[in-house]
């Protein structure tokens, strides 16, 4: 809805997710005897002021809702912000993680995965070419 400009419907859908997330009856301890979460999740009471504000709210909600699902990278690539977000993360984390000292995300290359050479060998180089940057 947000991408088509219907910010109010987008806000409604985001708030539905937030209402469900803060409902602790869905998050119980293993024996189901007590709440396992103490979320402080609020809804968006005011209409979004702009499409950009709505998009940012949607992206944050998706980040929270889909945490640990293994799809964040693909969201960042689809939204065209992978280089910005990943390089900001690397810049912050390399202070604490020595293996990130020379790491960087290369826009136009790292959005893609290399095609296994075995597949290129099977198909032939005329039919199948490597992704850009590989």
Can you say where each PLM-predicted feature lies in the sequence?
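Acidic/polar-rich alpha-helix caps and helix-coil junctions
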Residues: 1-134
């Amino acid at each position: 809805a947000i991408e088509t400009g219907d910010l109010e419907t987008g806000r409604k859908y985001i708030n539905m997710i937030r209402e469900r997330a803060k409902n602790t009856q869905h998050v119980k301890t293993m024996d189901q005897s007590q709440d396992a979460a103490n979320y402080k999740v609020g809804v968006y009471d005011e209409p979004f002021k702009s499409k950009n504000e709505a998009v940012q709210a949607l992206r944050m909600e998706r980040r929270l809702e889909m945490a640990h699902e293994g799809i964040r990278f693909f969201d960042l690539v689809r939204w065209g912000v992978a280089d910005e977000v990943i390089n900001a993360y690397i810049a912050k984390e390399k202070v604490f993680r020595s293996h990130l000292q020379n790491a960087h995300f290369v826009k136009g290359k790292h959005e893609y995965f290399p095609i296994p050479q075995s597949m290129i060998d099977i198909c032939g180089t005329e039919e199948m070419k490597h992704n850009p940057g590989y």
